[in-house]
């Protein structure tokens, strides 16, 4: 019984570290995503000047937001499992 409790405490600690790590990653990506969004907006406002950069910047912005969405889904799942005691 004691072994199960120790293992559960270790798992809980690992899950909490994972959750905190994901939150930190999300915070950093949110900042970068916001900057890319502003850059994309500025580029769009200046069109047709620098139109050659539009595709690359849009792709980078898309990829950041896709990754951010993926991390948020992982975080939500981990928090749900953590709250349920898994």
Swiss-Prot record:
Cross-referenced InterPro entries: Helix_hairpin_bin_sf (IPR029012), Put_N_fixation (IPR007774)
Keywords: Nitrogen fixation
Entry keyword Signal: no
GO BP, sorted A to Z: nitrogen fixation
Gene3D superfamilies linked to this entry: Helix hairpin bin
Keyword ATP-binding carried by entry: no
Entry similarity comment: Belongs to the UPF0437 family.
Protein name: UPF0437 protein Ava_4254
Organism: Trichormus variabilis (strain ATCC 29413 / PCC 7937)
């Amino acid at each position: 019984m004691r072994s199960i409790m120790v293992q559960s405490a270790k798992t809980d600690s690992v899950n909490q570290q994972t959750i905190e790590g994901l939150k930190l990653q999300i915070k950093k990506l949110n900042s970068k995503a916001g900057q890319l969004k502003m850059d994309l907006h500025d580029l769009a406002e200046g069109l047709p000047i620098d139109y050659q950069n539009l595709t690359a910047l849009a792709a980078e912005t898309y990829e950041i937001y896709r990754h951010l969405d993926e991390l948020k889904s992982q975080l939500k799942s981990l928090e749900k499992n953590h709250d349920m005691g898994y």
